[in-house]
């Protein structure tokens, strides 16, 4: 699809998370506010746009919307770059972001942890997302480091109990897959392109690098020699000679580095956060950043509930216009959720019975709320184009409760 809109939007090939580099795509930038995670700004960019280049423009737009520059701007690791952070701070703004794992400071601190334990302090407990019967714990390594790449921003180190579990499961899964691949490789050696020791070692190391476990496993290729004595062709006689042959072959062996594994467990659950404002307490830095998943939830709703497929609109200007419509639908959806949840909290009500079998919905979403009204109908008896009688289905307790929380009268609902 060719063409460009007046705002400069066009489709381009870019990095495809669906592994479809043949498809053109777009970048949908979305910003939400802290109050109810309501979307307040969006913009679409060409598909080859680097996410890091959008933060300055987004921050400037949010400053115009908010009317001030001292709000806290939270972003992912693409925000963690000197041009973006310096621009925000030079204009009296504040930012919090997670530090990319390839920064030197991250590897340096991990090496310190691998060498020996560092004192940390429990600073926050909160219910585990999607399972409030369990608790997630966050700890903070006492003291803070000043980043050496940017020279002026506070870098805080945290540990999550749930992330520690995920890191351990991920490492065990990678080790298991690496071992399975090494077993497959071991039956292929001594033939084809795997007859030399160097080629076998290279193939084994490629497997470890692919699974990111090269520092956790040790590879050994052992050389073996097999000698045989073979009779030459011909009749056995006084002049009969024997021929000796020697065949060289290799075997592949591997084992886990127990010391490296023990050291790696010390960095499980670790993640660093950067704050441009040193006056914000580490606990507050953590709580502010942990609001970020609500933005990911909006993106999930954008794809799953609204089933956005902008390329079906055929024309480039229609795509841009319909992305704005999707943004408005996300905003309305978020406002409904915010209204209902606030009313439940202020009135200290019990969770709504929105799920089948009258199960509780402690955090009702707009899609759940609207589904409760599915199947409700209005019936009209007409004669000669005139309505004689009109009936509606009976609303149950949950229906009336939801309408009350949304400040909608029952008569108004039937007129919608």
Task: State where each predicted segment sits.
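Anion-binding and metal-coordination hotspots
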Residues: 1-416
């Amino acid at each position: 699809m060719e063409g460009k809109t007046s705002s400069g939007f066009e489709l381009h090939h870019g990095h495809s998370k669906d592994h479809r580099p043949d498809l053109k795509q777009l970048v949908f930038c979305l910003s939400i506010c802290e109050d109810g995670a309501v979307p307040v700004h969006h913009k679409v960019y060409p598909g080859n746009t680097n996410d890091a280049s959008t933060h300055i423009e987004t921050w400037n737009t949010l400053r115009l919307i908010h009317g001030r520059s001292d709000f806290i701007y939270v972003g992912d690791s693409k925000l963690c770059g000197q041009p973006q952070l310096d621009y925000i701070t030079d204009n009296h703004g504040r930012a919090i972001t997670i530090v990319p794992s390839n920064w030197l400071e991250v590897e340096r601190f991990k090496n310190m942890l691998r060498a020996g334990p560092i004192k940390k302090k429990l600073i926050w407990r909160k219910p585990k997302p999607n399972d409030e019967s369990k608790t997630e714990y966050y700890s903070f390594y006492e003291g803070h480091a000043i980043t050496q790449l940017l020279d002026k921003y506070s870098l805080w180190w945290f540990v999550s109990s749930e992330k520690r579990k995920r890191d351990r499961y991920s490492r065990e899964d990678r080790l298991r897959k690496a071992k399975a691949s090494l077993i497959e490789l071991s039956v292929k050696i001594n033939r084809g392109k795997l007859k030399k020791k160097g080629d076998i070692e290279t193939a084994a190391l490629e497997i470890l690098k692919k699974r990111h476990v090269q520092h956790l496993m040790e590879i050994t290729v052992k050389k073996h020699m097999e000698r045989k004595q073979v009779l030459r062709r011909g009749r056995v006689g006084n002049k009969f000679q024997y021929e000796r042959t020697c065949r060289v072959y290799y075997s592949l062996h591997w084992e886990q580095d127990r010391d490296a594994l023990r050291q790696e467990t010390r960095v499980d659950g670790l993640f660093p956060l950067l704050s441009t404002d040193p006056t914000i307490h580490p606990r507050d830095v953590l709580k502010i950043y942990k609001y970020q998943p609500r933005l990911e939830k909006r993106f999930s709703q954008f794809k799953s509930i609204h089933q956005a497929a902008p390329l079906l609109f055929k024309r480039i200007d229609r795509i841009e216009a319909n992305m704005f419509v999707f943004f408005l639908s996300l905003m309305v959806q978020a406002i409904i959720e915010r209204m209902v949840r606030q009313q439940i909290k202020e009135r200290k009500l019990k969770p709504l019975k929105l799920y089948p079998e009258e199960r509780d919905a402690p955090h009702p979403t707009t899609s759940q709320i609207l589904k409760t009204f599915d199947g409700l109908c209005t019936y009209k008896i007409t004669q000669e184009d005139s309505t004689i009688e009109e009936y509606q289905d009976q609303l149950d307790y949950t229906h009336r409760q939801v309408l009350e929380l949304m400040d909608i009268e029952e008569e108004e609902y039937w007129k919608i």
